[in-house]
């Protein structure tokens, strides 16, 4: 077999006669924890909410897995699924934005980087938005902003509590100001939700950064976070260069932010649904049938 044929077979996914290493995440039978190196069956890892049984490391999960962990089985009703991003600036860096969108849509099965809808948690009705980091790093463009805004408005109209699961690199630069204005738009909708005396809880997962942190991620009545999640605005290196000093090793972690009053509580993923149910009951939320508006 020539070298050219070997690479051609590799591209087709055919065997080359060599033993190749299984991916560490998801596609093979086994998964290796990047923190402690523990190797476990993927099935066992998924059965533990994708949390390492050895060290508690929270592996990244997609929006569908997240919804399954939060919502009562069969209770999630998606909203505004038809909204699809455009390319208003005909933006191109190393690649065209339109190509990046098509690639992300094909890889994730999503139209954009957030899934929104209504659900029940232990029988209690709640509005839920889940950002998906697989879609262009969870970046917030006009569709992400519009879907979250519509969900907040729906929650306000129905007098429902709201949970937004944040996982984002920030505003989507390929949409320019159309992306940045989503920060103010969502914040305005959340203020009306607050004025209606309704509960809003953001859940900060790894990573939550940039314009998402600078807007709706930090506007909650109760700010929740997953253990060791990276949470910040600018990158660590940028801050160190600006301040000209070394930052603590745990800087921009969920634990650091909790110690400094920016996060109210850290909730392990395996305890999330029960913790949410307790918080909803504590704030007087009630069972409710979810019907189409």
Swiss-Prot record:
Pathway: Lipid metabolism; malonyl-CoA biosynthesis; malonyl-CoA from acetyl-CoA: step 1/1
Zinc finger boundaries on the chain: C4-type: 33-55
Subcellular location: Cytoplasm
Keywords tagged on the record: ATP-binding, Cytoplasm, Fatty acid biosynthesis, Fatty acid metabolism, Lipid biosynthesis, Lipid metabolism, Metal-binding, Nucleotide-binding, Transferase, Zinc, Zinc-finger
Domain of life of the organism encoding this protein: Bacteria
GO molecular function term, any single one: ATP binding
Named cofactor requirement(s): Zn(2+)
InterPro entries per the UniProt record, alphabetical: AcCoA_carboxyl_beta, Acetyl_CoA_COase_Trfase_b_su, ClpP/crotonase-like_dom_sf, COA_CT_N, Znf-ACC
Cofactor note: Binds 1 zinc ion per subunit.
SUPFAM superfamilies: ClpP/crotonase (SSF52096)
Reaction catalysed by this enzyme: N(6)-carboxybiotinyl-L-lysyl-[protein] + acetyl-CoA = N(6)-biotinyl-L-lysyl-[protein] + malonyl-CoA
Cross-referenced NCBIfam families: accD
Record note on quaternary structure: Acetyl-CoA carboxylase is a heterohexamer composed of biotin carboxyl carrier protein (AccB), biotin carboxylase (AccC) and two subunits each of ACCase subunit alpha (AccA) and ACCase subunit beta (AccD).
Membership in a protein family: Belongs to the AccD/PCCB family.
Protein name: Acetyl-coenzyme A carboxylase carboxyl transferase subunit beta
Organism this protein belongs to: Parasynechococcus marenigrum (strain WH8102)
Gene: accD
């Amino acid at each position: 077999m020539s070298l050219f044929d070997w690479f051609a077979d590799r591209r087709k996914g055919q065997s080359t006669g060599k033993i190749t290493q299984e991916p560490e995440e998801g596609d093979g039978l086994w998964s290796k924890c990047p923190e402690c190196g523990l190797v476990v069956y993927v099935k066992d890892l998924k059965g533990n909410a994708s949390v390492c049984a050895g060290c508690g490391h929270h592996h990244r999960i997609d929006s569908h897995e997240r919804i399954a962990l939060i919502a009562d089985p069969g209770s999630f009703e998606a909203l505004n699924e038809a909204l699809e991003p455009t390319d208003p600036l005909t933006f191109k860096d190393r690649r065209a934005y339109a190509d990046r969108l098509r690639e992300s849509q094909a890889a994730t099965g999503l139209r954009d980087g957030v899934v929104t809808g209504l659900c029940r948690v232990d029988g209690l009705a709640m509005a839920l938005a889940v950002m998906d980091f697989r879609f262009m790093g969870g970046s917030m463009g006009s569709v992400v902003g519009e879907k979250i805004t519509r969900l907040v408005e729906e929650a306000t109209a129905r007098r429902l509590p709201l949970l937004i699961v944040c996982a984002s690199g920030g505003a989507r630069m390929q949409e320019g100001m159309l992306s940045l204005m989503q920060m103010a738009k969502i914040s305005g909708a959340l203020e009306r939700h607050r004025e209606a005396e309704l509960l809003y809880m953001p859940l900060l997962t790894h990573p939550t950064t940039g314009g998402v942190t600078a807007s709706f991620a930090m506007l909650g009545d109760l700010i929740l976070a997953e253990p060791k999640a990276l949470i910040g605005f600018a990158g660590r290196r940028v801050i160190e260069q600006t301040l000209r000093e070394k930052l603590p090793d745990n800087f921009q972690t969920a634990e650091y932010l909790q110690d400094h009053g920016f996060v109210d509580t850290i909730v392990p993923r395996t305890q999330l649904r029960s913790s949410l149910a307790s918080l909803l009951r504590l704030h007087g939320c009630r069972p409710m049938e979810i019907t189409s508006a």
